[in-house]
């Protein structure tokens, strides 16, 4: 029975586009979220699996696992749901889907398939992104359980994105197998030994898989290959991978140690956390000695085998079939399967079959021991023969035919001197260019074979010289979180200053990135240390507010500040423009804080006093001065002068300090007589009159 694929989901919100990916459980389409106007990726479960409770549980688990995580190196999940569709028979069927972040780029698997082994610097940057994602998910209590190149996306901007948490499990549920039948709990080439044995997994299982990914990036191939999933799983449990430097001539041996520690058979010998793994890589790439330098993979393997033998020798109490589910690796599908518990007759039959399998396994083990003993004896004989062969000088070469490669590769020795020293030892130099190095151009970075190795006289020694730090543009990480910005910058090949600086910002939220130094877009050598600036959550009162119009300021800073508007007159600022602010310009306030602005109403206005005709001039002048106006006489101003008229007229609104013109005339003086005697006398007379 088949079901036609819908063209839209969630009531038309998600308009489905072309198919961009297909897996064993689901298809992925590019889609348009019409509500938010953004491009998304929609993973739709295959209709034939939607009615399988096991697969449905896995699908829902992915949505739940990732929805609670928010990390720049993990593909975000935006939404999930189930769409009801009609099958060809007309029956209604559910079609579960997950709406995810759309990442435009390539999977790491495709990149390796096309380009082969990656450069050391690219390996470093990809691993930093993967380990950032794992560090975050582990701290959230989630184990991925299927880390592999196919689940790692590299965006067009170089950002690493880990995806497909479909078999992820919470740490407290990590002992459970994923399904009751045909449930994949990891991909064979990246499977940890404990997963291969069906044991409880923890976050170190993810780190083992990450170590396998690092190995494949360095060499272009997985650490173990075979004709079947069983053969590969067996190697993960019991064999040590070929060192990367043996597969890639010239690759520094320190990568052997880092990969070996990450891929330790005994999880107790692995990196304890993703952060510890990441620190070791950064330490080495920055010229230090990583913790992995002291790791011995052969000791790890022998100790692991001894511990497992001891565990098998411990007395055990048989467990009834209904008490513990049987876990088995299916050699046909390459998958681990959980066989459902049985009861009654079924339980007896199951127990009988289990006893038969145990007897067969015991016989097989005895056979392996015998074969192993024979092989060991043969190897011992060959080793002895080889030693005798060498001691008898069967190669017919004297010690004079071999030379020890001198230590010539260091920052202080020039290319010409290195060549001369090698030639003086009877060796030739083959010059190679190291484009991954951040050392100055011409600096010797490595040799192959290494210094101290014995080689035939006349052999060529490969010597790599730095091509100089390659320049690239600083990515724009403005308005991103510190963690996301750091990941993007490191993925672009830069170092990031551990000390983060803060600065005020009017519009960028607290703790989000405001800028970098060097600035975004600037072309600088890879390996340059970038300093990140983040918002303090405070902002500065703008310095250019005074003199601007009220409307333009309110529009320009809308959402950034809360304004209170007051009015006042001003002799110097035009009406409608801002005269002053509080707090003062340059003051630091919280984002969205209050600023009071005063807006000019223009010069102060006063009313011309009610000066009537006949008022003496002196009185009129005093009345004008009392309200801040000046008097300008148009006529006599003596003590007898009287007002004829004023301009502007009484009651007029004029600018404070302006002049009022008073038209005056001389007043009349009245006659009078009087008599007096000596110094005394009396008299009367008329006053002034019109």
From Swiss-Prot:
Keywords: ATP-binding, Kinase, Nucleotide-binding, Repeat, Serine/threonine-protein kinase, Transferase. ATP binds at residues 20-28, 43. The active site is at 146 (proton acceptor). Residues 14-285 form the Protein kinase domain. Residues 429-453, 665-690 are annotated as: Disordered. It catalyses: L-seryl-[protein] + ATP = O-phospho-L-seryl-[protein] + ADP + H(+); L-threonyl-[protein] + ATP = O-phospho-L-threonyl-[protein] + ADP + H(+). Residues 668-690 have a biased composition (Gly residues). Residues 399-467, 468-536, 540-601, 602-666 form the PASTA domain. InterPro entries: Kinase-like_dom_sf, PASTA_dom, Prot_kinase_dom, Protein_kinase_ATP_BS, Ser/Thr_kinase_AS. PROSITE patterns: PASTA, PROTEIN_KINASE_ATP, PROTEIN_KINASE_DOM, PROTEIN_KINASE_ST. Belongs to the protein kinase superfamily. Ser/Thr protein kinase family. This is Probable serine/threonine-protein kinase PknB. The gene is pknB.
